[in-house]
């Protein structure tokens, strides 16, 4: 087992208790094999609505549906035994009212086995977060760049510079006070991210924020080089699996066209092989 491997699955209360301690490791997953690969090394595996873009070729996360989240959530759940699974609430499934949010969150958790839900928004979503937590649904909050709000934010811009910094600080304090067990800070300035981390009593999970956050998360297809439509500044590529995969497919195509594949070791003889009678 790798030196980074863990032994037991954390609960939301365990994640919250990690505030100021060992950094929390998080990645997104959308399939069973990928979940199995990261299970021993991640504290949190997020079934992110980013699946709409990286798996389904959609232009944004806005087109992602509950049915898509449930399908992929079930797949990821089957691949996990150690990491805690958190699932994104898709656009339109929680914004209308706390009651709508509860119905959607309960369905997501019931049908996927997720340990918590993640929703976007700060002060304006605090009432909804509190409503969910009071009814037994753990919530990971998400502030800063919130991809479901790109049409009102004006695109994928850094959030929290200038006067907006105080707004984000108040967002963080509001979701913490409402009962969120952690909060994602996306594409927020380093200094502000550190100030928020020091100002609230729940872990901050950074993505394009600061190494000083209580944990980090990346989209797995970004860090493995599988999603190549664009590369965000905050992404570190730990592998170039897209290039490796393309090269492997090209080699396979060449072998098929040259009749090198299947080779003798890949096919079956007409007669049954003789049993080995040697003792």
Swiss-Prot record:
Q: Name one GO molecular function term.
A: 3-methyl-2-oxobutanoate hydroxymethyltransferase activity
| One GO cellular component term noted in the UniProt record for this chain | cytoplasm
Where is this protein localized, as stated in its record?
A: Cytoplasm
An example of a Pfam family matching this protein is: Pantoate_transf
Cofactors named for this entry: Mg(2+)
| SUPFAM superfamilies recorded | Phosphoenolpyruvate/pyruvate domain (SSF51621)
Major subcellular site: cytoplasm
Question: Which catalysed reactions does the entry list for this protein?
Answer: 3-methyl-2-oxobutanoate + (6R)-5,10-methylene-5,6,7,8-tetrahydrofolate + H2O = 2-dehydropantoate + (6S)-5,6,7,8-tetrahydrofolate
Give the pathway annotation: Cofactor biosynthesis; (R)-pantothenate biosynthesis; (R)-pantoate from 3-methyl-2-oxobutanoate: step 1/2
State the source organism's domain of life: Bacteria
The catalytic site is made up of 186
The keyword Metal-binding is annotated on this UniProt entry:
yes
Enzyme class (EC, first level) = transferase
- Quaternary arrangement and interactors, per the entry? Homodecamer; pentamer of dimers.
Could you tell me what this protein does? Answer: Catalyzes the reversible reaction in which hydroxymethyl group from 5,10-methylenetetrahydrofolate is transferred onto alpha-ketoisovalerate to form ketopantoate.
**Which family is this protein grouped under?**
Belongs to the PanB family.
Q: What is this protein called?
A: 3-methyl-2-oxobutanoate hydroxymethyltransferase
